[in-house]
Every structure is written in C-alpha cells, then in structure tokens.
Amino acid sequence: MVGQPQPRDDVGSPRPRVIVGTIRPRVIVGTIRPRVIVGSARARPPPDGTPRPQLAAEESPRPRVIFGTPRARVILGSPRPRVIVSSPWPAVVVASPRPRTPVGSPWPRVVVGTPRPRVIVGSPRARVADADPASAPSQGALQGRRQDEHSGTRAEGSRPGGAAPVPEEGGRFARAQRLPPPRHLRLPGAPDRHRGQI
C-alpha cells in the first residue's frame, strides 16, 4: 500500500528479524538478536517497576542504548545517538553535532566527526602537548642526539672484536698525536716546535 512505511531488517545478523511496532522502525547494527525495539511500547519499562537491564534509559519512550550485547553498536537513525556501554570496545558517538569520546574504554580514540580532530587521549603526543613547550626538549634535538648515539655505536662496533679501541698511555695512538705534521702540510713561516724554532 502506498504511503505505509516498510519495516527494515537489522544489519549483520545471519537471520534478520524485522523490528516491528513503530511508525519509523530503527535498525540495530551488529547484534545477533536485537534486545531493544526502539520507540515501541515494548521498549518502555513495565508499570510494575520490574528492572530490565536491556533498557538503558528507563522511563524513556525512546531508549537509545543497548546493554548486554556481545559487541554493542550505535543505534542508527536517532537524532543524537548515545554511546553504547557494557562493550569491550565502546563505540564513538556517530552523527552527533557534538561527538564525545568513548566511555569506559582503557584506550580512548580520537573523536571523529568534528571539524578539528582531537589528539588521541593517553598518547605520548598528548602528554607532550600538555607540557610547557619551552621546558620540553625539541624533537629535532632528540632525533639528532639519537642519531649521533647510533652512528657512534655503529662506528665503534664495526670492528670484528666488537669493542672499540681504547687509547693507552704512551701507546701508538698517543705517539701519533704527538708527531709533527709532514713538511708538505706545514704553512710557510710556521714555527717548528720540534726543532726548537720559536
């Protein structure tokens, strides 16, 4: 019949079930068995006050959150979807004017859907950004220092023995430092200290 809305199926289920009882049925994504029928009379808490853990917002005609699903997802088609809790990996608020970070996640991720993506919470970059830029060492200085350290260890450890030579007192390294430069490298008129010229 023309003008009557067609009910939609839930996505990602091996046996799709139709969510009935609403004028505009919503879709629950990723659940094997949808627990809550959004916007229907069955989704409201019973009048006797029996608690229903699958209803997130009690006494609400349109509960938005699903509890107890193996991998809870955001309910699509809501004006302001809420974050689904009781999930190992909480989802980020999607299609919201003001998205918020995941709730209860040990590693929160970047807030998506905003004009300016925020810094990942709990990352090293976020800690450096909060610190004073004058007191924090520059990135180039740290990289240069690391490169010098790596290049030094590479040059010293390139010998077959693996250890760098240590100059001894009176050894050939010390004698080589005390020897004068060859005659063809001396500047004209330079004093020759080894011959007693001043």
UniProtKB/Swiss-Prot annotation:
Where is the segment annotated Disordered?
37-64, 94-198
Start-end of Low complexity biased regions: 94-121, 161-178
Bias (Basic and acidic residues): 145-157
Per the record, residues carrying Phosphoserine are S13, S78, S87, S96, S123
Keyword entries, A-Z? Nucleus, Phosphoprotein, Repeat
Extent of the sequence repeats: 7-15, 16-24, 25-33, 34-42, 43-51, 52-60, 61-69, 70-78, 79-87, 88-96, 97-105, 106-114, 115-123
Ranges for the region named 13 x 9 AA approximate tandem-repeats of P-R-V-I-V-G-(S/T)-P-R are: 7-125
Q: Which residues carry this modification: Phosphothreonine?
A: T69
Query: Could you name the Gene Ontology cellular component terms for this entry?
Result: nucleolus
Q: What is its main location?
A: nucleus
Q: What is this protein called?
A: Ras-related protein Rab-34, isoform NARR
Source organism per entry reads Homo sapiens
